[in-house]
Amino acid sequence: MKTAIIYRSKTGFSARYARWLAKILHADLYRYRTVDSDLLASYDTIVYGAGFYCGRLSGCRWFRKISEPLAQQRLFVYATGSMPCVQPRDLQKEWDMSFSRDFQKRLHLFYLPGGMNYAVLNPIDSLLMRVYRRAMLLSPFTAPDTRRLMLRLDRSVSYMDRGAIQPMTRTIYANH
């Protein structure tokens, strides 16, 4: 099974999961936008990982574009986020913002807990996150579990868990 792992990471969480997956799966590791459809055509399995930002997967348009011609490859996508866990209905909303339902049928989708690392965010992203956090805390429509998370996001936090990739690796091996 020839596997390519592609990642896009702003805060390091998606990159760390990508390195773990590459080691376990004996896969080739690539940064976002360093590959194209021609290179990926030689792989059986393609994994793309990135963070959710503002309700969508970072780089989702790019991934959709390069994977469209790859009809024979098995496609896996993981998203990292600042929540330790996500309600399925909320997660589906984010997948729907990222990919059409038809395209989702081609994908095996996974959520991996990431966190927040203010130290590596650029000033604009840091400001946007703080404004978003404040808006969520002030909104009367914010769900209680989201409110609890927003209270914790006043500082850097990590929910990374190496064990979180096990369902994904099992699915990749099972579909080989």
Regions found by a protein language model. Give the residues of each.
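N-terminal beta1-alpha1-beta2 submodule of the flavodoxin-like/Rossmannoid cofactor-binding fold
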Residues: 1-71, 166-176
